[in-house]
Amino acid sequence: MARLLRPEVAIVTKVGLEHYSAFRGKEAVAQEKGELVSALQPAGLAILNADDPHVMAMAKRTAARIVTFGRSDTADYRLDSAEASFPRLLKVTVSCSEGSFELQTAFVGEEFWIATLAAFATAVELGVAPDLAISRIASFAVPWNRCGILATNGGPTFIVDTVKAPNDSIPAAIAILSKSQPANKRAVIGFISDYTGGPRKGAALAYDLAYQCADQFIFVGENGHRARPSEEDRKNGKFIDFLLPKEASDYVRATSRPDELILLKGSQTQHLERIALSWTHDVQCWETNCGKYIDCLQCGMVEVPYNEHRKARKARARALRDKGMSRSG
């Protein structure tokens, strides 16, 4: 694909195990991501994470200009600080040849400094004035289901991170909860993917991390037992698991506090976002295997029972068609 598109700019933020199920290791992931850098023409630009040796090794695969960012003292765009503690949003301080700058973002977690710094470096290297880049970064709206905030009226506040849940992303998600200011916190974790070894590792990692910062850990799906909670944690309610998102949603609503923060972390096919949406919408679709790789708001049928979706879509298409005909007439 990179050879076909022939990019002029390549940005590589990091190499992790997010794609472990497909590539089985960081070396293979790095090889695949490096194809983007290899496809650059000599006049192109590669923006690389100076802290990741797998990323920096890609510099050897191109004759294009290399610009680096990261914590390293040798980085062209050096991270001086990254601070986030919800409700205080991420603020990044960066030093470069243009000077020192503060970047205020709408992100809730410190992990997003990587994307923020990469975006700033790319913009400035392409000729955008630093002040304009800072302004655009500050106004960037975070996608609502990628660690977006959904505040409810008189209910809890949700951090919605329900696009994907590779095992490699679990620590950063729970770190957001750990560093947040609200006194009452819960973690709702669903299906975890791309783990090395068996599924117990993913569930156990999530539970071990959340145990240290959350008042309660709620697991949704078939693998809750693999977290191996103690009998005491089950009895006192520190750990609870549900098979279905609807069951978890009903429980959260019945036990919620208006001042609490709840992290929702799961894969896109599980649609845990419905737990938060049930506070702002009349959620009627609780299908567990709809097969859609879009979120429930994109689908547009969250307030329609799943067995009525086809009928509702036909009615909606008919209404749009009739509306178009009336305009043309």
Task: Write out the residue ranges for each language-model feature.
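Acidic, Mg2+-coordinating active-site environments of NTP-dependent enzymes
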Residues: 2, 6-157, 182-183, 207-211, ...
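ATP-dependent carboxylate-amine ligase
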Residues: 63, 121-329
